[in-house]
Amino acid sequence: MTQEIFNIDYNFLNLFPLTLHHLQIDEFENKKQELIKFAYNLRETTNCTHNSNKGGWQSNVYKVNGDNFLESLLLNIFKSIPAFNDKIELESFYWLNINPTGAYNTKHNHPNSDLAGVLWLKIPKDSGDIVFISPKDFESFIELFSYTDEFKKKTNNYHIYNFPPKEGTMLVFPSFLQHKVEENKSNDDRISVSFNIKIKHEHFTMR
């Protein structure tokens, strides 16, 4: 029997999108050295925590109150995200990460918060992408094998997604989303600021 190929009018609809907010910080180059100096000074004067980090340095967690240059910058950035309406209040906490050669972050998410994110301060070439893992179930993972590469690229339909970091940019994403940071294969430090955000509203609290 000869197989007949039909011409069809084809469309698709993506439901329930998982939104990541990508921001470019204006005039970052004017602030870069001060931010990097702040990170190194903090490493010299405070204890190290490890959590998901392997081989690198993580600071303690601090509430964003606007008490220093970095906190003021974070507050101003959060207030400038156009997707957020003016009825919410954001309570945020941050920590710094310095990954030398060979350091990486294992798979994790950010519990007890609504959003998580990262601001990249120093990103040498080959210092490691942030890698997101799909929260979909195993059946959806199997479904991906049926799609063409072109369709997966067009719809961002992947099981894992490598996002290349860039200095002076920020990424904000749902805190439940599993992610990891690849090994730093450069000969220099990779420096970033991670943060958690709790969303408060007069009618509800997401968490």
PLM regions: where:
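Catalytic core of non-heme Fe(II) oxygenases with the double-stranded beta-helix
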Residues: 99-172, 189, 202-206
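Ligand-binding loop in jelly-roll beta-barrel domains
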Residues: 182-192
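Short conserved micro-motifs at the rims of enzyme active sites and ligand-binding pockets
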Residues: 34, 184, 204-207
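Non-heme Fe(II)/2-oxoglutarate
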Residues: 2-86, 104
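Histidine-centered metal-chelating micro-motifs
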Residues: 103-104, 176-180
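Short beta-strand segments enriched in hydrophobic/aromatic residues
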Residues: 121, 177, 197-199
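Active-site region of the double-stranded beta-helix
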Residues: 64-94, 100-114, 119-126
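Preference for bulky hydrophobic residues occupying beta-strand positions
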Residues: 23, 96, 119, 195-197
